[in-house]
Amino acid sequence: MFTTVRPQSTLTPPTANLIPNDLFTAINELKKDLNAVILAHYYQDPDIQDIADFIGDSLALSQQAASTNAEVIVFAGVHFMAETAKILNPDKLVLLPDLNAGCSLADSCPPEAFAQFKAQYPGCLVVSYINCTAEIKAMSDIICTSSNAVKIVNQLPKDRPIIFAPDRNLGRYVMEQTRRELILWQGSCMVHETFSEKKIVQLKIEYPEAEIIAHPECEPSVLRHANYIGSTTALLNYSQQSASQIFIVATEPGIIHQMEKETPHKRFIPAPAINNCACNECPHMRLNTLEKLYLAMKFKQPEITMDETIRLAALRPIQRMLEMS
């Protein structure tokens, strides 16, 4: 493994007496003491979103990480996001409240297997969705997010074949939008692949005036019913601008917190999963809590560290993305 983290063995085991009663105040005090910035993804719990200095999707968080003057970056997200912050900020302390906050999509693309896959298609440009490990980024020519994937692919030479990894659903969506053939790695997100088309159609029958808005990581069977498809930021913006008053939201329901804050008079219904859950929460994103956020800042652990060779190789395609965005 090239990407490593410092072990948590130096931490005092979290106990009730380590957690202050007023976590918001304690975290804000630590933030000042450390000259820290808290970056949070839209899929985090509402209380983490509310204490964050910046909330956004993967592209916005990458841009924020690249431009911050803070000495410490506390990333309330999942591992690949904290890795990206470290790639962009090798001299800063980057903390992830829970090291187990992984990503099923990133896990679906093991570096060794992807290297073999890439070798089968010499001469291809490799476009990798940011939801991947540092090792995959290091094997890529350019990184993209759901916000800019179509824009990125449209700017690439027409005479060069393209490998797109790791999300097959986003890849299919990009193919449709750009009318370019892509060689797709067959990865997927556990949240977005389990929305129930049948239940979504039933909801639409129950609320005929509702608009279905969906993330492009969703399966094609769901996307074909969507009135609007976009990244989390795009979905948030659309929900504010649309005249509709009811939305069926086919992405991780953490984004609904911001939607309700921006337009409290509108109704947002999380799209149901195939199973009996009322909605699709990402179990990895939800591992982060205010308590873990506080402890990470208090003990300056767990810290993201990385092999410099991998970091430099991964930095180049990220920088290309930021330049082309």
UniProtKB/Swiss-Prot annotation:
Principal localisation: cytoplasm
Residues annotated for iminosuccinate binding in this entry: 41, 58, 129-131, 146, 215-217, 232
Binding sites annotated in the UniProt record for [4Fe-4S] cluster: 103, 189, 282
One GO MF term: 4 iron, 4 sulfur cluster binding
Domain of life: Bacteria
Pathway field: Cofactor biosynthesis; NAD(+) biosynthesis; quinolinate from iminoaspartate: step 1/1
Catalytic activity: iminosuccinate + dihydroxyacetone phosphate = quinolinate + phosphate + 2 H2O + H(+)
Pfam family name, one: NadA
Biological process terms in GO annotation: 'de novo' NAD biosynthetic process from L-aspartate
Function: Catalyzes the condensation of iminoaspartate with dihydroxyacetone phosphate to form quinolinate.
Family the entry assigns: Belongs to the quinolinate synthase family. Type 2 subfamily.
NCBIfam families: nadA, PRK09375.1-2, PRK09375.1-4
Protein name: Quinolinate synthase
Gene label: nadA
